[in-house]
UniProtKB/Swiss-Prot annotation:
Annotated pathway: Amino-acid biosynthesis; L-lysine biosynthesis via DAP pathway; (S)-tetrahydrodipicolinate from L-aspartate: step 3/4
Main location: cytoplasm
Organism: Chlorobium phaeovibrioides (strain DSM 265 / 1930) (Prosthecochloris vibrioformis (strain DSM 265))
Function: Catalyzes the condensation of (S)-aspartate-beta-semialdehyde [(S)-ASA] and pyruvate to 4-hydroxy-tetrahydrodipicolinate (HTPA).
Record-given protein name: 4-hydroxy-tetrahydrodipicolinate synthase
Amino acid sequence: MSNQDLKGSAVALVTPFREDFSIDTDALKQLVHFHAEAGTDIIIPCGTTGESPTLNPEEQADIIRIVRDEAKGKMLVAAGAGTNSTRSAVTLAKNAEDAGAEAILSVAPYYSKPSQEGIYQHYRHIAEAVSVPIIIYNVPGRTGCNVSAETILRLAGDFSNIAAVKEASDNFTQIADLLDGRPEHFSVLTGEDTLILPFMAMGGDGVISVAANQVPAAVKQLVDSAAAGNLEEARRISRTYRNLFRLNFIESNPAPIKCALAMMGMIKEVYRLPMTPVSEESRRQLSLEMSALGLI
């Protein structure tokens, strides 16, 4: 695949579980078909929304294989494959590549609070270990560290397979620095559904979306409209779904989105600890909004 394929509407896929907490492979296959039919450009299993910290390496590889096989070339398959140990992150990236992932989404090393040089070296080792494109996942609200624009651009300049960043913050100064300084091969994606419109208006390349789990066609239309310069249509879609986007984070992701998908009859509402169901009040608000949108 080309690095230029890392654009458009990408879904941060949930991992469906059975009541015994095993992977619900039937539901997983149906989710992949749902996204293929909706026109999703990129499907990303085993990320934060997929409860990756609760998956063992064998489960991650199995999920990637299933998604790859069911996607049948209709969507690009990028897989979450990151952790805070560089050695383990390299192993996960290799395993994902071996399982058929066409790109890797690798989260910044969390908890350790490394220096920018430590972050650079972390991604350098991953880039040298795999041949597929790598998406840097910068989510300072979860990791406790920010991958600076300078570090991201340094990596993009030094390694041809450092192909994109998922910028999951509202730091528009950093976003502008990335968009202005990036090399031609490098994509900048937002990880914030509520910011799709302003992000795309600045010249961003797309979104890695939680809301695409429940409204993939709408997210795809929003991204495509903004990319085509049809801002009036993009504003209409953004206004329609803005409250839903907000409610998907009323509690820690992925609890609200899995609750929503269970309401839609697409998965069972089963989580692996420490993730637990949302409160009754959050459930009520989600239900009201989804009913108003005709989703349930």
